């Protein structure tokens, strides 16, 4: 039975593949081992479900984060493009931005004459904002966006892998449970048959 859970088959992130029970009698040689075996399968099933919940939470965070990164990148690129045009009027840019989930407002952004002086502040999280030159900010945002998209792809693959393994483990648990029910019924019938024998 221990060899079932020591499978070397894993996905790219090291999540082990669920074993499939073809014949319960080959796994449980002694009926007294049923509880131990069933508990191991239940434990593995709960681990898969926990991993799936964790990956789904990661996907939810990434699906919120990616649009924010895309919007921030788009704004930074617009600022850089505006400064590249070298507008002679030196008039500030009028921007509309989201202040809250349901609240938008306007802002005037003064573009410095020298592009090297063009800087943006990026929220890094944990109430930390850093000021970056526009080109560095764009490179950082592109890298963060690519990393987030890669993480989303990986997490989505893991969720699908876990979903398949959860199904396999649920089938295994059902087969083990049904085997035990059948064994108990057979044992009960055998005991009743023995009672009916008269010597």
UniProtKB/Swiss-Prot annotation:
GO terms for cellular component: cytoplasm; prefoldin complex. Belongs to the prefoldin subunit alpha family. It holds the Pfam family Prefoldin. This is Prefoldin subunit 3. Binds specifically to cytosolic chaperonin (c-CPN) and transfers target proteins to it. Binds to nascent polypeptide chain and promotes folding in an environment in which there are many competing pathways for nonnative proteins. Heterohexamer of two PFD-alpha type and four PFD-beta type subunits. The modification N-acetylmethionine is found at residue 1. The gene is PAC10. Keywords: Acetylation, Chaperone. Present with 6550 molecules/cell in log phase SD medium. GO terms for biological process: microtubule-based process; protein folding; tubulin complex assembly. GO terms for molecular function: tubulin binding. Gene3D superfamilies: 1.10.287.370. The keyword Acetylation applies. It comes from Saccharomyces cerevisiae (strain ATCC 204508 / S288c) (Baker's yeast).
């Amino acid at each position: 039975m221990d060899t079932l859970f020591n499978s070397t088959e894993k996905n790219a992130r090291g999540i082990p593949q669920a074993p499939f029970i073809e014949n319960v009698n080959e796994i449980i040689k002694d009926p007294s081992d049923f509880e131990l075996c069933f508990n191991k399968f239940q434990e593995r099933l709960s681990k898969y479900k926990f991993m799936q919940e964790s990956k789904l939470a990661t996907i939810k965070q990434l699906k919120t984060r990616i649009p924010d990164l895309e919007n921030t990148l788009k704004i930074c690129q617009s600022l850089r493009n505006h400064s590249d045009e070298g507008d002679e009027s030196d008039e500030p840019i009028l921007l509309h931005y989201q202040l809250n989930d349901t609240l938008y407002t306007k802002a005037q952004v003064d573009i410095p004459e020298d592009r090297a002086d063009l800087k943006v502040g990026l929220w890094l999280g944990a109430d930390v904002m850093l000021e970056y030159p526009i080109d560095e900010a764009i490179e950082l945002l592109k890298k963060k966006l690519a990393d987030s998209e890669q993480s989303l792809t990986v997490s989505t693959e893991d969720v699908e892998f876990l979903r398949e393994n959860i199904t396999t483990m649920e089938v295994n648990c059902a087969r083990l449970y049904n085997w035990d029910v059948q064994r108990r019924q057979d044992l009960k019938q055998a005991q009743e048959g023995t009672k009916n024998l008269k010597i």
